[in-house]
Amino acid sequence: MCLLIDAGNSRIKWALADTARHFVTSGAFEHASDAPDWSTLPAPRGAWISNVAGDAAAARIDALIEARWPALPRTVVRASAAQCGVTNGYAEPARLGSDRWAGLIGAHAAFADEHLLIATFGTATTLEALRADGHFAGGLIAPGWALMMRSLGMHTAQLPTVSIDAATNLLDELAENDAHAPFAIDTPHALSAGCLQAQAGLIERAWRDLEKAWQAPVRLVLSGGAADAIVRALTVPHTRHDTLVLTGLALIAHSA
């Protein structure tokens, strides 16, 4: 049994896995929220941790583990040149984020023998190009949908700050008015839709460019908290997989 922890900038996701491909239970919590209830969980043989949220998150994770399973062995996952069938094309492999690395490993296992473009929607939107043979060819990083909207609100004098929940409601309203969709006739709707279309445009352009460059079909795989919103703007085929990082961590743990 392995405890898997994926600490992102917005949330900490966790799972208990009894094999490389099966979670016994899982959950998620906000950084500032109450601790997860691990009181009934069986003791794992160790914890495998991907943390891109900094020192404070690392300290909290350590405290949570220590409170439930004192002295439990912990492995902080870092990207390497090659692991679990994936080779790292970064110029400096260790500088690739551990979440992106684990996600690549999870995606390669989930969609074996397929070329992939993996789009993950969180605080940042990341794109990873993964060849069918497991070679990570490189990626792109852009502001996430929420960060785009928040940045416009913070750094312009007259634009509002729109949250994801508010933007989702605004887009529902816009979709009901076919006469204007996808163009808006007021600022909050225009900001919400514009940032959403920017996300979708990035994904679709990258997918088409990759298929052209590789002269082969590429599966577009979507993951992350904002994927539900982005999907509504996409016009290309895609597949959802929302546990890529945890799946990758499970594979890493069971290969140790």
Swiss-Prot record:
Its main location: cytoplasm. Substrate binds at Y90, G97, S98, D99, R100, T187. It catalyses: (R)-pantothenate + ATP = (R)-4'-phosphopantothenate + ADP + H(+). It is found in: Cytoplasm. Keywords: ATP-binding, Coenzyme A biosynthesis, Cytoplasm, Kinase, Nucleotide-binding, Potassium, Transferase. Signal peptide: none annotated. It comes from the Bacteria. Pathway: Cofactor biosynthesis; coenzyme A biosynthesis; CoA from (R)-pantothenate: step 1/5. GO terms for cellular component: cytoplasm. ATP binds at D6, A7, G8, N9, S10, R11, I12, K13, T123. This is Type III pantothenate kinase. It comes from Burkholderia mallei (strain SAVP1).
